Structure formats: C-alpha cells, structure tokens
Amino acid sequence: MTKDIQVKKLLHPRNLHRGHYDLKQLCEQSPLLSTFLRTNPKGEQTLDFAEPQAVLLLNQVLLKQFYHVDFWQIPKGYLCPPIPGRVDYIHYLADLLGDTFHGKIPEGKQVKVLDIGTGANCIYPILGSQSYGWSFVGTDIDPLSVKMAGLIIKSNVSLKPFIKVQLQANKQAIFAGIIKPKDKFTLTMCNPPFHASMEKALAGSARKIKNLSNDQNNLSRVLNFAGQEGELCCAGGEIRFLKQMIQESKDYARQVCWFTSLVSKSDNIAPLKQQLEKVGAEHVKVIKMAQGQKVSRFIAWSFLPQPQNF
C-alpha cells in the first residue's frame, strides 16, 4: 500500500509543505524517486530519507513544483537541506516584518535580505525570493559555494532578478567587507555553524543516520551530503560565532532593521541576550518555531528605536 509521506505537523500556517507529501505524484514527477521507496513495518511504502540521493531528488521536485526552480544541484560533500524546515524560517521572518510594519507583511524587492553563509544550495534566497519577492544578497567564505549558488541563479530565470551572491574574502569576519557604507538591509539571516570541530560534526551526522537507518554501510553515502567544514563547525561553536555576529552588528546598527539568526541550542539564548544588552540593542526577540516534536528558534535584534524598512 502506498502512503503519503507525513510532513512535520506543526509547520508554519503558510508553509506549503504542511500535511502530507503525495508520494505517487512525487514519483511521477521524478521517476528515479521510486527507486528509493521502502516498505515500513506497517507494510506501507515510504521514502528512504537515509539515502542522500532520495533527499536530493525530493528537493528538486519540491523546488520545481512550488518555487519555480528548474535547475538545482549541489556538489558532492555539501549540505543538502530539507525544504520544509528551511522555509519555516522565511515565513517566521515574514511575520516579524508584519509585526514591525503595522500588521502587513511586506512583499517585493524593496525588502532586502542579507543571508550569511548561503551555501552551495542557496536555499534561503531561493525560498524567500519565490515566497515573498524579496531581494537577497547571499554570502559565503567558500569559493565553490559561491560559484555553485551563482550557477543556480544564472540557470533559473525566476531567480536572476532577485538574488546576488558574494564571497566573504575575510574568513574571520561576518558583516565586515560585505555591508558597504551606503547599504541598507531590512533583514539579515543566518543558519550558523553548530559544532566546535569537524569531529563533533561528523559524530552528530553519524547519530542522525543511525536514527534514520539501520544500514551502517549507508553511512559513507549519507556523509557525502553531510556538509563541508564551514557549513558545520567553527572554532568555539555556535555560541562564539553568534557572539561575534552580535559584536559586529553594532557597527551596522543604522543600516539594518533586524539582525536575525537561528539558534540551535536553547542554552545559548541567555548568554546571547546578555551580549545584546552589552552592545545596546533596543529590541530583542526570541521566536520559537515548532516542527513536530522539535522546537527550533531564532533570535532577532535591532538597534533602531522604531524598526522600519529603509
């Protein structure tokens, strides 16, 4: 018996991926997906999410069907992100702007977003531009990520008017060298590196794979899409990265309406709030995003007495 794949129940109300994937329809659009169908203990067919190629094919179908993206590919060894959870961040950012601008979510290119660490997949600029028409500047310290993201943009007429990517030449900086004196951004966003070392990152990936599949021979294949070092880790881990981001953000206090970043570890929220108080942030918000049994969150801060678009 074929079963629709249930997507996490508590995605944002505007998330197009709430409910179930139509497995039959997905396989019709991408016949190769059918080779990754598996039978669960209940005798139902489902997709093998422990197979990286299955996730890649699923993303390609979803991006084409819902976000007008005809070409999307990532190099071997780079992060392959799940679409539903990534677009949730975009929708909650839209809510933040709606609250800021008197209840109306702003759409169009006048909303300018800076995505820190956009990656080879360019996923946040894709989802944000196609969901709300926002314009994006994506940055990354990895030349191949910038090159691949640029290829994705050039290969899709739907993306070219909305997205630019830029190499962050200084690997020790976040905003410095990217935000120019005359630049204004409505938002910055970031999915920061979580781990303090590549060893810890790979161990975390291995645990995740073990939960998805009992086939330990699958581990090497899955790690092909586990992510590069710059995507997964940095010295000091997430907390050090975000403290640096907060410190740097003060230098651009009048050029950005809202600085934001995902925060993977809830224990990091308190020290981040303390850091924001030290640098004089006028407004600080922690916004929770419930996705099934998992609760993620992002922190947002502004130095403007009354945050507004520029």
Swiss-Prot record:
Keyword Ligase assigned: no
One of the record's GO cellular component terms: cytoplasm
Reaction equations catalysed: adenosine(1618) in 23S rRNA + S-adenosyl-L-methionine = N(6)-methyladenosine(1618) in 23S rRNA + S-adenosyl-L-homocysteine + H(+)
EC number: 2.1.1.181
Methyltransferase recorded as keyword: yes
GO BP annotations, alphabetical order: rRNA base methylation
Subcellular location: Cytoplasm
One GO MF term attached to the UniProt entry: 23S rRNA (adenine(1618)-N(6))-methyltransferase activity
SUPFAM superfamilies: S-adenosyl-L-methionine-dependent methyltransferases
Domain of life: Bacteria
Subcellular location, principal: cytoplasm
Pfam families for this protein: Methyltransf_10
Keywords from the UniProt entry: Cytoplasm, Methyltransferase, rRNA processing, S-adenosyl-L-methionine, Transferase
Signal peptide: none
Family the entry assigns: Belongs to the methyltransferase superfamily. METTL16/RlmF family.
PANTHER family in UniProt: RNA N6-ADENOSINE-METHYLTRANSFERASE METTL16, SAM-DEPENDENT METHYLTRANSFERASE
Family matches, as HAMAP family: 23SrRNA_methyltr_F
Function: Specifically methylates the adenine in position 1618 of 23S rRNA.
NCBIfam families registered for this protein in UniProt: PRK11727.1
Protein known as: Ribosomal RNA large subunit methyltransferase F
